[in-house]
């Protein structure tokens, strides 16, 4: 659980944004405490390690935290999650903070950057989030989780066609994929159909703007005889 003695109010410039985010995606007091601890840590590390775009800091809660939390409503029964390229912790650490209240809930956070992986480990330690950090390329870490994951996620990591290639072994074993995408979602869907057969469900982001969530439940290669394309390492 988040260390309440270390909890401090959000900076004044973020207070209104936090309130707006929690109106969009309400959470328990315990999860809010974990998220407060996470945001405070992220702001400390941001000064020395570029975890998120500085231009988005004024909307950290709505642009990043709420954007991540909204995935939970699309997979309410999912217990085990796998987050590709967790980076600064969106959505992985946010999900771990929320799932800490769920019996058996956990997130595996895959990140190949050593500094970012160190931040993710510290974030899980400080918040008490339910998760584990895996320092590896996505393509090198997927097969071990086939049949063990309920939901796979990714945000600002790779084009959709590559994400599908990585996630296919998990989806084949029953996992749902939820990929957060932006204004180029139509172009990415068009490109992905060149390699994959799939029927996506598109959900507009609760945070507004041009964000979308691509939900996938079944995928197959366009050419069944060709090797499964995994794309470049990420």
Curated annotation (Swiss-Prot):
Main location: cytoplasm
Residues given in the record as S-adenosyl-L-methionine binding sites: 85, 90, 155
Catalysed reaction, written as an equation: guanosine(527) in 16S rRNA + S-adenosyl-L-methionine = N(7)-methylguanosine(527) in 16S rRNA + S-adenosyl-L-homocysteine
Top-rank taxon: Bacteria
A GO term for molecular function: rRNA (guanine-N7-)-methyltransferase activity
Localisation per UniProt entry: Cytoplasm
Any one GO CC term of the record: cytosol
A Pfam family assignment: GidB
Keywords: Cytoplasm, Methyltransferase, rRNA processing, S-adenosyl-L-methionine, Transferase
EC number: 2.1.1.170
Family the UniProt entry places it in: Belongs to the methyltransferase superfamily. RNA methyltransferase RsmG family.
PANTHER family reported for this sequence: S-ADENOSYL-L-METHIONINE-DEPENDENT METHYLTRANSFERASES SUPERFAMILY PROTEIN
Entry function: Specifically methylates the N7 position of guanine in position 527 of 16S rRNA.
Protein name, entry field: Ribosomal RNA small subunit methyltransferase G
Organism (species): Rhodopseudomonas palustris (strain BisB18)
């Amino acid at each position: 659980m988040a260390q309440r003695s270390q909890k401090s109010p959000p900076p004044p410039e973020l207070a209104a944004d936090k309130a707006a985010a929690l109106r969009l995606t309400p959470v328990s007091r315990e999860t809010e405490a974990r998220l407060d601890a996470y945001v405070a840590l992220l702001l400390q590390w941001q000064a020395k390690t570029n975890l998120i775009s500085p231009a988005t800091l004024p909307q950290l809660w709505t642009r990043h935290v709420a954007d991540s939390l909204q995935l939970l409503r699309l997979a309410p029964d999912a217990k085990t999650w796998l987050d590709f390229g967790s980076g600064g912790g969106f959505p992985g650490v946010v999900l771990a903070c929320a799932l800490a209240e769920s019996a058996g809930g956990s997130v595996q956070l895959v990140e190949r950057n050593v500094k970012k992986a160190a931040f993710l480990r510290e974030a899980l330690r400080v918040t008490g989030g339910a998760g584990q950090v895996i320092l590896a390329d996505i393509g090198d870490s997927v097969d071990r989780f086939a049949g063990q994951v309920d939901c796979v996620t990714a945000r600002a990591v790779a084009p959709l066609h590559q994400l599908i290639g990585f996630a296919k072994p998990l989806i084949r074993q029953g996992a749902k994929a939820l990929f957060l995408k932006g204004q180029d979602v139509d172009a990415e869907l068009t490109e992905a159909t060149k390699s994959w057969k799939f029927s996506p469900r598109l959900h507009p982001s609760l945070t507004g703007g041009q964000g979308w969530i691509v939900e996938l439940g079944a995928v197959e290669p366009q050419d069944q005889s060709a090797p499964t394309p995994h794309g470049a390492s990420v």
